[in-house]
Amino acid sequence: MTLQDEIKKRRTFAIISHPDAGKTTITEQLLYFGGEIREAGTVKGKKSGTFAKSDWMDIEKQRGISVTSSVMQFDYAGKRVNILDTPGHEDFSEDTYRTLMAVDAAVMVVDSAKGIEAQTKKLFEVVKHRNIPVFTFINKLDRDGREPLDLLEELEEVLGIASYPMNWPIGMGKSFEGLYDLHNKRLELYKGDERFASIEDGDQLFANNPFYEQVKEDIELLQEAGNDFSEQAILDGDLTPVFFGSALTNFGVQTFLDTFLEFAPEPHGHKTTEGNVIDPLAKDFSGFVFKIQANMDPRHRDRIAFVRIVSGEFERGMGVNLTRTGKGAKLSNVTQFMAESRENVTNAVAGDIIGVYDTGTYQVGDTLTVGKNKFEFEPLPTFTPELFMKVSAKNVMKQKSFHKGIEQLVQEGAIQLYKNYQTGEYMLGAVGQLQFEVFKHRMEGEYNAEVVMTPMGKKTVRWINSDDLDERMSSSRNILAKDRFDQPVFLFENDFALRWFADKYPDVKLEEKM
């Protein structure tokens, strides 16, 4: 098989949703169909003691939530599938947003009882901005939920995207009978306890059975007043195919997977900072780091840089250019993943996600190229923290572990580090409270370093050019600090303090992001 044929087999997508919509459950079922797990485990691990395959971090297993992005790969129906299971909790949106830069499509999981929720809307806006295809799975049909037509209407009104149902539910909750597959003209009957029946000549059964009268009326209405199916509109991100089903009972999931792989796009190109698009079928290797994760194997205190291959082929031992530093690096110890388990790989192609063992060489957003290519891909999104805490080691004898832990966890990008200019105290910045809790848990569990954390409340952060800096600018209304790149930054008590500073120093330029 040629390199181009291998690349065209790749399907790389993220699964997005509001917390508890069933995202991790559907991921489990997809892995089951891909032959990677023998059975899809019950995801509600915090009560049952069984854990999701994709939730590998200890705190994820304890709480039954996803707080990091997992990467999983399997072969199915002649395709190489790369799934990125993203954290649904809003505190981890920075990690999620970066992950969405590394995929070619998104699967949006919606709870049939709740419809479009806040986090789903936020994540959809990022996906929409990238113009990548969105496939919608409306979940939990085995429970009572909202009317299917209402859900489609909400999709279009709240998210502003046209929808096209690929199947249609017959009943819901206790009266759930199955799904009519509009795309394949097939009837799938639901019998509970993961027992199903599939009837190929669904049209004939529909026509002769009065039980399906309401469903027939809904379908006729959709055919008359609904949107037309267009594969191009799907690829352009203007039309979302909608699938109904129940991830927990594994009903409708395989039909979704089969149809998704039929219409999901091949790997696409990525823009450079100069506006050029790098073709995935180009011969030369290129890629970018979209995530760094410490302690995927706590026994070895390792760090993995996750790289999306944009073009060409990776071969073990190859040399690459790290554009940010202008230096070279050798990709010798490279892995691919099934959540926390991994295996060494000798080659991978555009569309694949690889993990490069990192000793501190890489940063999130780094571009890797070969030969004379020295371009950089467009920067990944960054977020300014709003909540702050002072942090110190509880035991002075554990300073080495404390500093090691802070260094590694900050480099992941899930939390940000600042150092008080005057006192040298460490301060952590986060988007949400859960990030602090996860930081504390991981410091104690992975680095054996207990920490003391003191809330500082909300702050307004602004960076300042070092040439403009005068330490006398620091006052009771602000804290002068350095970020982890030694750039000076002010943490203002509130917007009033920021305006006061701007009035007093009108010639000093303050930046929201560096």
Swiss-Prot record:
This is Peptide chain release factor 3. Residues 8-268 form the tr-type G domain. It is found in: Cytoplasm. Belongs to the TRAFAC class translation factor GTPase superfamily. Classic translation factor GTPase family. PrfC subfamily. GO terms for biological process: regulation of translational termination. SUPFAM superfamilies: EF-G C-terminal domain-like, P-loop containing nucleoside triphosphate hydrolases, Translation proteins. Pfam families: EF-G_D2, GTP_EFTU, RF3_C. GTP binds at residues 17-24, 85-89, 139-142. One of its GO terms (molecular function) is translation release factor activity, codon nonspecific. The gene is prfC. GO terms for cellular component: cytosol. The keyword Nucleotide-binding applies. Increases the formation of ribosomal termination complexes and stimulates activities of RF-1 and RF-2. It binds guanine nucleotides and has strong preference for UGA stop codons. It may interact directly with the ribosome. The stimulation of RF-1 and RF-2 is significantly reduced by GTP and GDP, but not by GMP. Keywords: Cytoplasm, GTP-binding, Nucleotide-binding, Protein biosynthesis. InterPro entries: EF-G-like_DII, EFG_III/V, G_TR_CS, P-loop_NTPase, PrfC, RF3_C, RF3_dom_3_sf, RF3_GTP-bd. The keyword Cytoplasm applies.
